[in-house]
Each structure stands twice: as structure tokens, then as C-alpha cells.
């Protein structure tokens, strides 16, 4: 039995304000808003729901896992070449298609020449190092360069030669799932009094 919910722009803006007011710390995942709306809708008919959030990461279903087989070849491309490609792609108007060639080239080039365990997260980031530097003030950047931030975010004990699906799965399980996906589904559902498993 399927149910359909439609939301108008006023409901979306009101929900955005509710989510913003309830968040006690930043969460950089914009999908919290549709997850909040879905949880609100589900709460009208159920008290407990099952979620598929995290399944692709757990079972290695996303593109970063498929790319693990190619990391050893991508590691041969120097970082400065990756920076040139990234800068060039940022100047070319983007296409709206999800996973378009423009999108893929721009994001993959961000990781070129960096340690393997950083590449995947650099690909996934909505911002290049240049974007990050442009957004933050010079005093902050002088103390915390984007490279230093990446080094601090990713655990130092992760082997710099990480290139296997198993290692990527460990990284996702230790960092991405608990700090993004699972936090998002937990907050969005609990804000509506819905238990999600």
C-alpha cells in the first residue's frame, strides 16, 4: 500500500525553519529537509519505520566503491594536474544532469595526487580547496589550510595506500555513516517523534 505526499513551497520553507531551529550543531547534508518531511508524513500513520539510509555505504553500492579499483591508476596523475583540471572545470558552466561528465571530471580531479584515503572524500565534497579558501577569511586560512583541515578530519591511522573496497568501507563506516547519514536520519525522524531503524 503506497501513500503519496505533496508539499508546497510554504510547507517546505516552514519545515526548513523548524529544522534550522531544532539543530543544535551544524550538519552539512541538505537531504535532512526531505528526510524531515518524509518522517513527518510517515508519523501520521506509523510510529516505527525502517530506513534504507546507509545501505549503499554499507554494501558498497555507490560510485566511490566502484572507483576503488581505479585508484592505483589515478594515483599516477600528479596533484598539480588535478588542480588545473579542477580550476578549468569550475570555469565551465555545469550541466544539470546528475553524474554528468562535467560533474564526474570536476569531482574526480579534486582528489588527484592526494593520498588515496582522502580522494573519495575530496570527490564527495561540494567544495574544492579553492572554494574553501575563498569562503574562509585569510587569518583562518593562514592557520588552517584546506590540506590541514583534510589531514585533521581523516584519521591518521588510515593507511595512505588505501585503495581497496574493504578499506573504503571501513572509512565510510567510521566517518561518513555516523557523522552524516545516520545523524541525518536520526535527527529528522526524532524531530517528528518517529522511531527509525
Language model regions located:
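Structural motif
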Residues: 28, 32, 159-172
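Globin-like tetrapyrrole-binding proteins
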Residues: 177
Amino acid at each position: 500500500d503506497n501513500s503519496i505526499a505533496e508539499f508546497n513551497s510554504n510547507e517546505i520553507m516552514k519545515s526548513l525553519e523548524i529544522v534550522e531551529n531544532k539543530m543544535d550543531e551544524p550538519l552539512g547534508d541538505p537531504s535532512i529537509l526531505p528526510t524531515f518531511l518524509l518522517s513527518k508524513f510517515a508519523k501520521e500513520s506509523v510510529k516505527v519505520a525502517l530506513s534504507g539510509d546507509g545501505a549503499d555505504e554499507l554494501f558498497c553500492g555507490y560510485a566511490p566503491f566502484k572507483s576503488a579499483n581505479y585508484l592505483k591508476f589515478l594515483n599516477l596523475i600528479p596533484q598539480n594536474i588535478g588542480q588545473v583540471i579542477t580550476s578549468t572545470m569550475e570555469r565551465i558552466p555545469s550541466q544539470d544532469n546528475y553524474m554528468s561528465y562535467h560533474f564526474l571530471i570536476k569531482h574526480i580531479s579534486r582528489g588527484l595526487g592526494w593520498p588515496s584515503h582522502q580522494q573519495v572524500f575530496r570527490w564527495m565534497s561540494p567544495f574544492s580547496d579553492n572554494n574553501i579558501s575563498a569562503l574562509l577569511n585569510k587569518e583562518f586560512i593562514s592557520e588552517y589550510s584546506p590540506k590541514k583541515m583534510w589531514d585533521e578530519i581523516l584519521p591518521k591511522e588510515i593507511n595512505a595506500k588505501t585503495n581497496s573496497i574493504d578499506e573504503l568501507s571501513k572509512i565510510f563506516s567510521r566517518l561518513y555513516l555516523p557523522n552524516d547519514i545516520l545523524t541525518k536520519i536520526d535527527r529528522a525522524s526524532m524531530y517528528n517523534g518517529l522511531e527509525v531503524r
